[in-house]
Swiss-Prot record:
InterPro entries: aa-tRNA-synt_IIb, aa-tRNA-synth_II, aa-tRNA-synth_II/BPL/LPL, Anticodon-bd, Anticodon-bd_dom_sf, Beta-grasp_dom_sf, TGS, TGS-like. This is Threonine--tRNA ligase. Binds 1 zinc ion per subunit. It catalyses: tRNA(Thr) + L-threonine + ATP = L-threonyl-tRNA(Thr) + AMP + diphosphate + H(+). Belongs to the class-II aminoacyl-tRNA synthetase family. It is an enzyme of class 6 (ligase). Homodimer. Pfam families: HGTP_anticodon, TGS, tRNA-synt_2b, tRNA_SAD. GO terms for cellular component: cytoplasm. The gene is thrS. GO terms for molecular function: ATP binding; metal ion binding; threonine-tRNA ligase activity; tRNA binding. It comes from Thermus thermophilus (strain ATCC BAA-163 / DSM 7039 / HB27). One of its GO terms (biological process) is threonyl-tRNA aminoacylation. SUPFAM superfamilies: Class II aaRS ABD-related, Class II aaRS and biotin synthetases, TGS-like, ThrRS/AlaRS common domain.
Length: 659
C-alpha cells in the first residue's frame, strides 16, 4: 500500500500498516518521538491501520493533538485504577461496570457503576493507582473482534458495554484497546485514539470530583458515578488550572447567591424555578432598566405577552411537537368542556408574530422592532439543572425585528452595536464572534437560496464593519437561517456563549406574514431574533461569578452603608442614609449594637461599595468619612461632595469608582 507524507512524497508500506510503521520507515528519531498522526485530516494513534492512499503527518509530544491522545488514555487508566482499587478492597474487578470515558475540555471522565459508592475522599487513592500505572509504562495494543466475540466478552457482565456494542452498525469495525496483559492490565471497547504506552502520559493530572450521571443522559436509566479528571502537558498549566478551579469555587454563583442573599431555589416551589430575593431583584431590575433605555433609544417598541398560549399557536410555529421533550406538557380542560389546549410559553417569538400579523403592514413600517422581557418555560431534566445557569423558568430580553431582505445588514449592525454596548458597560472585554452559515452539502435548510446568500453576505459585512474578530462556522446555521453569536471570556478566562442574533426565514413563511412593498405587491418579511442577555437568570449567574459578587456601584444591591462611631451619632447616620435615599442611592444606616469595626467588616463581607463612617467631627461638619471597598479609607469629605460623585458613578454606570 502507498501513503503520502506532508511534502507529497509517496511511501510504500505493507498492507495493514499503521502510523507506527510510517515512523519506523522514517528512521529511529521519528520512531522514538512519534505519538500519533493526522491521517486525511483525522486524528489517529500509532496503532490503527491506515487507509490506502492516505496523507499522513506524524505527531510528537510538541503537537497540540498530543493532549487529546493522552487525555483519552488517562480515561482508560482511570478505569483500570478503579478496578484495581476495588480488587484491593476484596471485590471482583468484574463487579466494576463501565459506561463511557471520553475526552472533554481540559481533561476526561469515566462513568462507572461500582460495587460501593465512590466519594471525593477516594480520589487520592485512585489517583495514586493511576500514577503507578503510568510508571509501569504499559504498552497499548489495538485489536478487532466480530460482533459475536465482542458480545461474548461482556454478556452477563457489563450491560453498558453490551448496549454500546449492539448499537454499532452492522459491518462497522468493533475495536478494543488493551494496556498491559489480560490478567493484570485493562481492556476496553474503544475507537481510540491513544498514546503508544501509559509511560508517554505526562504526570500533570488530577482527579477533581465525583458526580452522578444517568446512563446515556436518561433519567429513567441507572444512575452511574462520573469521575472527572483534568490533565495538561506541563506542571505550570495544571497549577494555573487548579488555581482557577479554587477561584471558581469562591465565585460560584450558587454559594454567593446564598451568602449575599440574591436568590434561592426552593424545592417546595419547584426544581429550576428561581425566587429573586430583594437584593438579587435589584440587580435584575437594574439590568432590565439599562436594556429598556437602550432599546427605546434605538427604536424598539415594548410589548407584553402572556405566560401561556394556545397549543395551536405552537403547532403553527413548529415548536410543538418538534421540541415537546423540552417543554412542559399541554394544559387541557377538556373534562370541563373546553376544547382549546394551552402550553406554558417556551418561546416569545410566536406571540410577537401575532402582534405583527394583527393588521396589514406596509414597507414604510419596517423595520418593526418588538421587544419584551418575556418569561418562558422549558422542561430541563433534573440532572441538568444548575443554579441560575440552567433553570426551568427564565426571562429573556427578547426582541424580534421584522424587516425587508435588504434591511438585514443595517439591522444586524444595530443589534451588534447594542450587544457591544452591553459588553462594554459590564467590562466584558475579551470576546469573539462566530457566524453560522449553511453546510453546502446539506438539504435541511428552508428558504430561498438567493435570500440565504444575501443574508450570509450581509452578516459578514456587518461583522466586518463593526470591527469584530470573527470566524465563519460552516454548518452552524439553524435550518431556518444564518446566525451570529458571541463567545465571551469572564474574569477567570472561562468562555460563555452570549448575544445570539438569528435570521429566520421559516416563521414568516409558516405564519404567512406579509408586507405591502413599494410596488403595491405583498412580500414576505425577514425576521431577526435577538437577546443580548439571553436569559436574565443565566446572565446574572455569569455576572455574579465574573465580578465575584463585587458588583459595580450601579448594580450593587446596597450601594452605601452608614456606620456611626457610637450611639451619639445614630441620628446623624440615619439622616445621612435618608439623604442618600432621597437622592436615589440604595443606602442603609447600620445602628446595630455591635462594635464599629464589626459593622464595617460586615459591610465588606456583603460587598457594599461604600461605607460611610460618621463620628462627632463628621456630624459637626455635615461630612462623612468614606471607605471604598478594596481601596480602604479615602478620608473625610462633605456629604454633598460624596453624593455628587456617587450619583455620577451610579447614573453613568461606571465600572471604576469615582473616588
Amino acid at each position: 500500500m502507498t501513503v503520502y507524507l506532508p511534502d507529497g512524497k509517496p511511501l510504500e508500506l505493507p498492507e495493514g500498516a499503521t502510523a507506527k510503521d510510517v515512523a519506523r520507515a522514517l528512521g529511529e528519531g521519528w520512531e522514538r518521538r512519534a505519538v500519533g498522526a493526522i491521517v486525511d485530516g483525522e486524528l489517529y494513534d500509532l496503532l490503527k491501520p491506515l487507509p490506502q492512499g492516505a496523507k499522513v503527518r506524524l505527531l510528537t509530544e510538541k503537537d497540540p493533538e498530543f493532549q487529546t491522545l493522552f487525555r483519552h488514555t488517562l480515561a482508560h487508566v482511570l478505569a483500570q485504577a478503579v478496578k484495581e482499587f476495588f480488587r484491593e478492597k476484596g471485590y471482583d474487578p468484574e463487579s466494576v461496570r463501565l459506561g463511557v470515558g471520553p475526552v472533554i475540555e481540559k481533561g476526561f471522565y469515566y462513568d462507572i457503576e461500582a460495587p460501593e459508592p465512590l466519594s471525593d475522599e477516594d480520589l487520592p487513592a485512585i489517583e495514586a493507582k493511576m500514577r503507578e500505572i503510568l510508571k509501569r509504562d504499559l504498552p497499548l495494543r489495538r485489536f478487532v473482534l466480530s460482533r459475536e466475540e465482542a458480545l461474548a466478552r461482556y454478556r452477563g457482565k457489563d450491560p453498558y458495554k453490551t448496549e454500546l456494542i449492539l448499537e454499532i452498525p452492522e459491518g462497522e469495525e468493533i475495536s478494543f484497546y488493551q494496556q498491559g496483559d489480560e490478567a493484570y492490565g485493562f481492556t476496553d471497547l474503544c475507537r481510540g485514539p491513544h498514546v503508544p504506552s501509559t509511560g508517554r502520559i505526562p504526570p500533570h493530572f488530577k482527579l477533581t470530583h465525583v458526580a452522578g450521571a444517568y446512563w446515556r443522559g436518561d433519567e429513567n436509566r441507572p444512575m452511574l458515578q462520573r469521575v472527572y479528571g483534568v490533565a495538561f502537558r506541563t506542571a505550570e498549566e495544571l497549577k494555573e488550572y487548579l488555581w482557577q478551579l479554587e477561584e471558581a469555587k469562591k465565585r460560584d454563583h450558587r454559594r454567593l447567591g446564598r451568602e449575599l442573599e440574591l436568590f434561592l431555589i426552593d424545592p417546595m416551589v419547584g426544581k429550576g424555578l428561581v425566587l429573586w430575593l430583594p437584593k438579587g431583584n435589584v440587580v435584575r431590575e437594574e439590568l432590565m432598566a439599562f436594556m429598556r433605555e437602550e432599546q427605546v433609544r434605538r427604536g424598539y417598541q415594548l410589548v407584553t405577552t402572556p405566560h401561556i398560549g394556545s397549543l395551536e399557536l405552537y403547532k403553527t410555529s413548529g415548536h410543538y411537537p418538534y421540541y415537546a421533550e423540552s417543554q412542559f406538557p399541554p394544559i387541557s380542560f377538556k373534562e370541563r368542556g373546553e376544547e382549546e389546549e394551552y402550553l406554558l410559553k417556551p418561546m416569545n417569538c410566536p406571540h410577537h408574530i401575532r402582534i405583527y400579523a394583527y393588521r396589514k403592514r406596509s414597507y414604510r413600517e419596517l423595520p418593526l422592532r418588538l421587544a419584551e422581557f418575556g418569561t418562558v418555560y422549558r422542561y430541563e431534566k433534573a440532572g441538568e439543572l444548575l443554579g441560575l445557569t440552567r433553570v426551568r423558568g427564565f426571562t429573556q430580553d427578547d426582541a424580534h425585528i421584522f424587516c425587508t431582505p435588504e434591511e438585514v445588514k443595517g439591522e444586524f449592525l444595530g443589534v451588534l452595536d447594542l450587544v457591544l454596548k452591553v459588553f462594554a458597560t459590564l467590562g466584558l472585554k475579551d470576546y469573539r464572534a462566530r457566524i453560522g452559515v449553511r453546510d453546502p452539502k446539506s438539504d435541511k435548510y428552508v428558504g430561498d437560496e438567493a435570500k440565504w446568500a444575501l443574508a450570509e453576505r450581509q452578516i459578514e459585512e456587518a461583522a466586518a464593519e463593526a470591527g469584530l474578530r470573527y470566524t465563519v462556522e460552516e454548518g452552524d446555521a439553524a435550518f431556518y437561517g444564518p446566525k451570529l453569536d458571541f463567545v465571551v471570556k469572564d474574569a477567570l478566562g472561562r468562555e460563555w456563549q452570549l448575544g445570539t442574533i438569528q435570521v429566520d426565514y421559516n416563521l414568516p413563511e409558516r405564519f404567512g406574514l406579509t408586507y405591502v412593498g413599494k410596488d403595491g405587491e405583498e412580500h414576505r418579511p425577514v425576521m431577526l431574533h435577538r437577546a443580548p442577555f439571553g436569559s436574565l437568570e443565566r446572565f446574572i449567574g455569569i455576572l455574579i461569578e465574573h465580578f465575584a459578587g463585587d458588583f459595580p456601584l450601579w448594580l450593587a444591591p446596597v450601594q452605601a452603608v452608614v456606620v456611626p462611631v457610637s450611639e451619639k451619632q445614630e441620628g446623624y447616620a440615619r439622616e445621612v442614609a435618608g439623604r442618600l435615599k432621597e437622592a436615589g442611592l440604595r443606602a442603609e444606616a447600620d445602628t446595630r449594637p455591635e462594635r464599629m469595626q464589626a459593622r464595617i467588616r460586615d459591610a465588606e463581607v456583603q460587598k457594599v461599595p461604600y461605607v460611610l463612617v460618621v463620628g462627632e467631627r463628621e456630624k459637626a461638619e455635615g461630612a462623612v468619612s468614606v471607605r471604598r471597598r478594596k481601596k480602604g479609607n479615602l478620608g473625610t469629605m462633605p456629604l454633598a461632595a460624596f453624593l455628587e460623585g456617587a450619583l455620577r458613578e451610579y447614573r453613568e454606570r461606571r465600572l471604576e469608582p469615582v473616588f
